[in-house]
Amino acid sequence: RLESVKILPSEGTDNSPELYGAITADASSMAEIANPQAKRVFCMAVTADKYVTKDGAPSSWSAELDSIIAGVIDGIKKLYVVSAGNVQFDELKNTQYPSANINHTIEDPGQSWNAITVGAYSNRIQLDDKVFKGWNPIADVGELCPFSSTSIAWDNKWPIKPEILMDGGNAITDGTNIDICDDVSILTTNRDVIGRPFTTTNA
């Protein structure tokens, strides 16, 4: 059974960073109150790229997430899977791979000790689109996805993140320029379920 709790506000507004932890706790509680007997895995693919702790130190959000997972308030331990956060396309163009991935550290709250943080590797290298004739994938099979953040730059006293990797697609280059295309991207669902139920993405 799939459950969903919205934690992002309406378009054009933002939650206060000081409330990220409380909002996450409320979202967890809403799901558990609605169906207390269910055994669930929480998946949170939302990060705060504006509030990255470059050294891996805890934030109020990651600390609250650790508390939620440990069951400090309700005595119920939880399994949380969170995203590591994405290297932006402009970073790849300006800094290049893999330096951009080293410089872009895991985004808040991915530094949570108790959460399983998910990064990405690349598994797609076949390029058939004739528009990109002469281009090549940036990452080889099994290598770090060009869009995945890392914890390489963190202080040694903080955990090594991410714990697991999943296929996050790839990017392509002609030796000078960088781009993306469907051939090396991940198929996913689209919000336009009638007109275009599927789309592609990179993570």
Q: Where in the sequence are the language-model features?
A:
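Substrate-binding/access-modulating region of protease and related hydrolase catalytic domains
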Residues: 8-114, 122-125, 198-203
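Extended, compositionally biased low-complexity polar/Lys-Gly-rich tracts
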Residues: 1-2, 115
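Extracellular S/T/G-rich loop segment that most often corresponds to the catalytic His/Ser-adjacent loop
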Residues: 104-203
